[in-house]
Amino acid sequence: MGDFLASIWWMIVSFSVLVTFHEFGHYWVARRCGVKVLRFSIGFGTPLWSRRSSSGTEFVIGAIPLGGYVKMLDEREADVTVAERNQAFNRKSVWQRIAIVAAGPLANLLLCMLLLWVLFVIGKQDYSATVGRAEHLAAQAGIHPGDRITAIDGRQVTSWSEASMLLTAAAMDRQNAVLSVIGPYGERSEHTLELSKLKQPFDERHVTALVGINWQFMLQPPIIAKIEPGSIAEGAIKPGDIVLAVDGQQTLSTEDLYNQIQKLGRDGHPGMIEIRRGEERLALELSPRKSAQGVWLLGVKTNPGPVPAFDSQQRYGVLAAVPLAIRETARMTADSLGMMKRIITGQASAKNISGPISIAKIANASAKRGVGWFIYFLSLLSLSLAIINLFPIPILDGGHLLYYAIELLKGSPLSTRAMAAGQYIGLALLAGLMGLAFYNDLLG
């Protein structure tokens, strides 16, 4: 329950920050263009707070914190007095209307850049891209446990998250990747990871595991959380015990334990389960039982072991961080557009489209990891909001920009009928996209 409420809270905080910047972009440029803004609202529904400025704008915080809007004076929506007609949005030139509409996504792009600048100044704690286990394609490439990946295809890597992202992009493009690594004793080498050998189709969310790379910080002995009543573990294993090895094979993850128990069951003999209980190290002889589903079980539930301290953090000076933030924003934009292209062309699965449930979970997880992680999450979300809003779909900012582009080409605005038809098409497309996102959330 605690995680559920925390996820909702951090999602509200995230959306509120991003929506405020987005709508302020529209508001600020509208005022510069001489448009009267009637209402600036963060959230929908019943106003929880409101205040009217000297310019006549009502600033509102709504009860439903799932978006926001800027309502401008417009003759197409209500009667406008003769004295105020020059302040109506629809009376402005097409270039002014383009500037007002584009200002929202641009504000989110600038926010992304600002957040990344802050991140480079304060530093984001992370884990280095140090390999804990190398199997399958990684082992074939000559990667060994203890190797730290420093670059992939010439692009510098400072953390496991960067390495995972670059490997995923290369795998989706069906390209091999050249990994520059530093070994445990400082020796440098390069290895070609043959990602083109990955069996198609594959789950893009687990590329590193599929190629056989397990990151060192993730490999921690599992902790027993619960004992099933009547199981063979009852009376022998206790909650809090840490599983160290099974039949002499080191246990470094919950997945390890599962695979080792299955092997014990298939081999048909008891196995020695080594555990640590407090300061004691014990060896227990146990035989797994086969469930009705054909899975071998000890009768325990486990939690991942304690995560070690972060071992990677880089800070930069206030001025030095500016070009870094600009370059990182450009890189993230290119990566995001590349992913969208892959989804559209079928190179990547539509499962990569996340909805509010996934966003809430990620917001909570990043907030738990620390300020730097949450800032990075906000920068990604802000950039995504900017890009999505520029889609040429009616009802989104990009759809309005499409209307104005057509107006520039034909010399006159689209008819009300054509714009209304576009709105219906836009609603249908957006509803389909949101439905897919919710479906992916529920499956995930």
From Swiss-Prot:
Keyword Membrane appears in the UniProt entry: yes
Cofactor(s) essential for the protein: Zn(2+)
Membrane topology annotation: Multi-pass membrane protein
Transmembrane segments: 98-120, 371-393, 418-440
Claim: Protease is one of the keywords in the record: yes
UniProt EC number: 3.4.24.-
PROSITE patterns reported for this sequence: PDZ (PS50106), ZINC_PROTEASE (PS00142)
Gene3D superfamilies linked: 2.30.42.10
Active site: E23
Primary location recorded for the protein, binned into one broad class: membrane
Domain PDZ intervals: 192-278
Location relative to the cell: Cell inner membrane
InterPro entries: PDZ (IPR001478), PDZ_6 (IPR041489), PDZ_sf (IPR036034), Pept_M50_Zn (IPR004387), Peptidase_M50 (IPR008915)
Pfam families, per the entry: PDZ_6 (PF17820), Peptidase_M50 (PF02163)
Keywords, in A-Z order: Cell inner membrane, Cell membrane, Hydrolase, Membrane, Metal-binding, Metalloprotease, Protease, Transmembrane, Transmembrane helix, Zinc
GO BP, sorted A to Z: proteolysis
Recorded family membership: Belongs to the peptidase M50B family.
NCBIfam families registered for this protein in UniProt: RIP metalloprotease RseP (TIGR00054)
Record protein name field: Putative zinc metalloprotease PD_0327
Source lineage: Bacteria, Pseudomonadati, Pseudomonadota, Gammaproteobacteria, Lysobacterales
